[in-house]
Amino acid sequence: MSKIIGIDLGTTNSAVAVLEGTESKIIANPEGNRTTPSVVSFKNGEIIVGDAAKRQAVTNPDTVISIKSKMGTSEKVSANGKEYTPQEISAMILQYLKGYAEDYLGEKVTKAVITVPAYFNDAQRQATKDAGKIAGLEVERIVNEPTAAALAYGLDKTDKEEKILVFDLGGGTFDVSILELGDGVFDVLSTAGDNKLGGDDFDQKIIDHLVAEFKKENGIDLSTDKMAMQRLKDAAEKAKKDLSGVTSTQISLPFITAGEAGPLHLEMTLTRAKFDDLTRDLVERTKVPVRQALSDAGLSLSEIDEVILVGGSTRIPAVVEAVKAETGKEPNKSVNPDEVVAMGAAIQGGVITGDVKDVVLLDVTPLSLGIETMGGVFTKLIDRNTTIPTSKSQVFSTAADNQPAVDIHVLQGERPMAADNKTLGRFQLTDIPAAPRGIPQIEVTFDIDKNGIVSVKAKDLGTQKEQTIVIQSNSGLTDEEIDRMMKDAEANAEADKKRKEEVDLRNEVDQAIFATEKTIKETEGKGFDAERDAAQAALDDLKKAQENNNLDDMKAKLEALNEKAQGLAVKLYEQAAAAQQAQEGAEGAQATGNAGDDVVDGEFTEK
């Protein structure tokens, strides 16, 4: 069975891993980095992903960041003169990760396990699966990020029974999961979180502070200047990271804008104490889900054996201190918070292929599921933290006499009234025979698969007529849209490949011209004019093809030049070897002669 890669598709950074033997290994990107910025930019028709895209974010307005925060919504982003869905942008990131994973493995990759925040709803999970499909990946499993982290942490501890709390604060989302580990079973007891809390919010606090201070000093509002704001974002992110290691950092942004008297510069010192003060409310928000998860699991703090920190934002000292204060435990630092989720996803891939044995993952649904009933009430069928996959049925009836159809309004959330919860979809069961209210028996069945994706069935028990839908929210893509996007992605991949081949060819041509010119110069006056003339003619032909920008001609002329240049190089080598041999022969003869001069005749006298 082909390899199944594990992908952590993050808000700020993404990572890809693969199982090698029994060990999960992070695959470095082409720049040698173990995580890749989740940034996509467009330039001259080219799609740029990762580090290169992030570097040009300041100067390129067609750059998209933090697209994960829009997954599961109908919101689109404008770039490159087009509108893109969050699924399409995410697919570009996935395609890039897939590409360099294939380069590392030396084989085609078609399957992946992709992680999502535990608190992602059905629409967000479906959007992630669609993004994988657009990128040419069969998504074998959607796994919750804290669960994946627990897999990576606990794989070598399957003989040990313990309860762990995973505190996962990423770039845009926050999750807390409590798991019980033992005998190879990873049982999620509860999960809680906040999909609107992450490292980006900490950056924003610094940005708001810098904008306010600059306005106070110079009377200019930088928030209206797009380029200045991108520079501030980069500086804020760097300052946040610096303050994880030092207590004070200098923010210096020369020529940030211009005033009446000329250019203005932003110079400011930010202390850790000030940063802690600015972000105090964000840190406080992390405490509620911790308490919620413990309550749902029916556990006290004393029953938690280990606290695992996941996500780059858990490096913030105030966050670490808050975790210590809230749990009464020193966090376990045996895992890399940036890499552990992708590694866990790769392990789950190994479980699917059978390479990892005796491991069972029991995950849960993060939010309750149900339907709207009379009076706008939300009636739950499946409670949050129910182990998945699962199925649950309940019988309902009509609200009016002779009602010919029922509308099924499918919801996800925890609020008692339907209007306050997230609509997953609506469908209708029709042709109900005329009967007084309360007589028809309508059975509604909810199914949640192993990926946390929901399907709902309504059945008239009297007529056995049924209607089934796989939930597709208003942000969901149709099969036709996904197919079109897949074709676009494949076309872009082909165009990117051609572009890379073109760049490689041009580099080879430049290198060949440089090397041949050097060789021709070195062989001047050394007696093999025919070979030099042939190489010079081939060199001139290649330069002409280069000037005409004819790629096919350049390729042909490059091969011809390499052949002629090789002939010249062989002659040069043979001449050098002959000279070396002659020199060694002369030195040998001289050594023999000198040895004869040193011989002294002696007389032997017998005593």
UniProtKB/Swiss-Prot annotation:
Keywords: ATP-binding, Chaperone, Nucleotide-binding, Phosphoprotein, Stress response. It comes from the Bacteria. One of its GO terms (molecular function) is ATP binding. The modification Phosphothreonine is found at residue 173. Residues 598-607 have a biased composition (Acidic residues). Residues 580-607 are annotated as: Disordered. Residues 580-591 have a biased composition (Low complexity). Induction: By stress conditions e.g. heat shock. PANTHER family: HEAT SHOCK PROTEIN 70KDA (PTHR19375). Acts as a chaperone. Belongs to the heat shock protein 70 family. HAMAP family: DnaK. This is Chaperone protein DnaK.
